[in-house]
């Protein structure tokens, strides 16, 4: 599992590690790891290094000595010659690096202007060099993080560098995993410098293909039956949006619950049972609900009905417009950016600029887990701890995919998983199913549902491959 930590957490871990090794040794670890990561860079015979003040620039300068030893030509652009890392500059120059006034279009660019301690945004010469990168498009590698990003907030609305590759040290940062900042990082490579024993619990985690053990809690007991596996209630669709009911049920069928109860109009219930005879269209006890996908005029009543059962509930789509002020039962809210904007009474653009901030605000406001759907779906607990999904394909931006996701996660909830774990695993497996359904090409929501059972089996067996989005190296 990938994990990310805040700047404060990283600073404390670095202090503890440096107390054991010394700061010089720690910088040398980072420098060597950076140089090794640069060995296969396109146009790697020449590199221009944008050198800022402090340790970030020092890491790059010491890495330059390794590159020079390997026959690479290194040009140094000093952002502030009076504040440059003196020992690093001396070592680079003694090995053959040359100082130049401005970057050129030769080779690739190493962004070492600012690290994790800097404020978001760039000014003056740093902003000019970032604009030069945007204009000239050299292959750009960021040292630890691209300069100008909001590291802890994972935003990128101020002036910043956009990198093709980010070589980050010790642990991932929120900005390297969460959009929109992550989109400015390109591919991300982690260099181990020994921080692990000194890091606290992460604020962000990412499920990976080999994390199948996380789903073991949802496996059926050998002596169990359909009721012990869990019953999920589906209240989805309407006469106008009948397809949402079918797709939500299809997602639930692909999950881990032993039985599905469907609640809807008589006409819709007949359609659902006619298509899926395993479904029971009668009220009865359930262990979890999925409510709202394609809902009609009765959705407010269905919200009340589901909450009255005092079992975990997933609220999607139109159900999000009828939420009480808080909950006393486990709840998972699954908005997209527009729905979250409506819930919080802000513009959609505000959510898209700072999705993590707004997802955390909603989780705290409703004391519920929030799954914010997007290219990198976020799952956020009320305490702010977060899971980021990196599986999937842009082809999953298709009608009905969210209905399948709601039913599938509802099934996981009915098995006993928490809203956070059900949302995190559900998003990951749903994304993987989108890839498996038609690798590299378009998929329909029904095809995603059909692919899910085999994806779940592969996940449990540790055999999932090719599920990653770009930017996850």
What are these regions, as identified by a protein language model?
Residues 103-107, 160, 283, 307:
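A short, aliphatic-rich alpha-helical micro-motif
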Residues 1-76, 165, 174-317, 321-332, ...:
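Small-residue (G/A/S/T)-rich helix-start motifs and N-terminal tracts that mark the onset
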Residues 84, 125, 159, 400, ...:
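Short acidic-hydrophobic sequence patches enriched in Asp/Glu that either
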Residues 92, 152, 466-467:
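Intrinsically disordered, low-complexity, compositionally biased regions/tails
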Residues 106-108, 113-205:
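Internal gly/pro-rich beta-alpha loop/helix module
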Residues 35-113, 121-143:
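Nucleotide and nucleotide-moiety/phosphate-recognizing core
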């Amino acid at each position: 599992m990938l994990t990310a930590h805040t700047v404060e957490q990283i600073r404390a871990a670095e202090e503890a590690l440096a107390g054991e090794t010394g700061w010089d040794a720690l910088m040398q670890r980072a420098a060597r790891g950076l140089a090794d990561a640069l060995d296969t860079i396109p146009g790697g015979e020449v590199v221009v290094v944008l050198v800022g003040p402090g340790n970030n620039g020092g890491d790059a300068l010491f890495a330059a000595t390794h590159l020079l030893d390997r026959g690479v030509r290194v040009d140094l652009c000093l952002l502030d010659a009076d504040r440059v890392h003196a020992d690093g500059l001396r070592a680079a120059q003694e090995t053959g690096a040359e100082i130049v006034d401005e970057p050129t279009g030769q080779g690739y660019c190493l962004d070492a202007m600012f690290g994790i301690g800097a404020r978001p945004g760039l000014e003056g010469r740093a902003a000019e060099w970032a604009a030069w990168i945007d204009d000239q498009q050299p292959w750009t590698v960021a040292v630890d993080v691209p300069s100008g990003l909001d590291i802890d907030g994972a935003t990128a609305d101020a002036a910043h560098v956009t990198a093709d590759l980010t070589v980050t040290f010790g642990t991932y940062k929120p900005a390297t995993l969460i959009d929109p900042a992550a989109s400015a990082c390109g591919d991300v490579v982690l260099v181990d410098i020994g921080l692990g024993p000194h890091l606290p619990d992460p604020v962000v985690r990412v499920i990976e293909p080999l994390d199948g053990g996380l789903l073991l809690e949802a496996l059926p007991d050998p002596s169990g039956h359909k009721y012990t596996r869990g019953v999920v209630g589906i209240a989805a669709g309407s006469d106008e949006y009948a397809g949402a009911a079918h797709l939500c049920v299809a997602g639930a069928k692909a999950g881990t619950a032993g039985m599905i109860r469907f609640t809807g109009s008589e006409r819709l219930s007949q359609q659902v049972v006619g298509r899926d005879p395993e479904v029971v269209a009668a009220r009865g006890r359930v262990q979890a609900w999925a409510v709202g996908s394609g809902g009609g005029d009765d959705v407010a009543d269905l919200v009340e009905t589901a909450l009255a059962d005092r079992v975990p509930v997933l609220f999607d789509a139109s159900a999000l417009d009828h939420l009480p002020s808080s909950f006393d039962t486990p709840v998972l809210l699954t908005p997209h950016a527009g729905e979250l904007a409506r819930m919080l009474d802000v513009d959609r653009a505000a959510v898209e600029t700072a999705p993590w901030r707004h997802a955390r605000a909603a989780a705290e406001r409703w004391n519920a887990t929030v799954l914010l759907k997007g290219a990198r779906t976020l799952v956020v607990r009320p305490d702010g701890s977060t899971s980021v999904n990196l599986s999937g394909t842009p082809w999953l931006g298709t009608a009905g995919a969210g209905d399948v996701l709601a039913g599938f996660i509802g099934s996981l909830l009915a098995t006993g998983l928490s809203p956070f774990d059900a949302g995190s695993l559900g998003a990951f497996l749903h994304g993987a199913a989108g890839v498996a359904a038609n690798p590299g090409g378009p998929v329909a929501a029904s095809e995603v549902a059909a692919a899910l059972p085999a994806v779940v089996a592969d996940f449990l067996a540790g055999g999932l491959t090719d599920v990653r989005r770009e930017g996850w190296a």
